[in-house]
């Protein structure tokens, strides 16, 4: 093989090695991003659950207040 062919082969191998290294770094970045997104998703799920509980509690309190108001209005009607 001629020296030029060996140089071309070396250049191609170096390009392939560089490409592999870049792809490995990109894979690591994507893994980190995936982990961050999974953590964020878990936090959002917990927040949603908490908000659903608060909503349920507020609906129950609202219903209780409506019942109290109805009872008071009923008593006022009885007084008249």
UniProtKB/Swiss-Prot annotation:
One of its GO terms (cellular component) is cytoplasm. GO terms for biological process: division septum assembly; FtsZ-dependent cytokinesis. InterPro entries: Cell_div_ZapB. Its main location: cytoplasm. It comes from the Bacteria. Residues 3-80 form a coiled coil. Keywords: Cell cycle, Cell division, Coiled coil, Cytoplasm, Septation. It is found in: Cytoplasm. Belongs to the ZapB family. Homodimer. The ends of the coiled-coil dimer bind to each other, forming polymers. Interacts with FtsZ. Non-essential, abundant cell division factor that is required for proper Z-ring formation. It is recruited early to the divisome by direct interaction with FtsZ, stimulating Z-ring assembly and thereby promoting cell division earlier in the cell cycle. Its recruitment to the Z-ring requires functional FtsA or ZipA. This is Cell division protein ZapB. It comes from Vibrio atlanticus (strain LGP32) (Vibrio splendidus (strain Mel32)). The gene is zapB.
């Amino acid at each position: 093989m001629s020296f030029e062919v060996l140089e071309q082969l070396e250049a191609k191998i170096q390009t392939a090695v560089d490409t592999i290294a870049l792809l490995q770094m990109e894979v690591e970045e994507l893994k980190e991003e995936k982990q961050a997104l999974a953590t964020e998703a878990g936090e959002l799920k917990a927040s949603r659950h908490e908000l659903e509980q608060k909503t349920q509690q507020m609906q129950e309190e609202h219903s209780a207040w409506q019942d109290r108001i109805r009872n008071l209005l009923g008593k006022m009607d009885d007084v008249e």
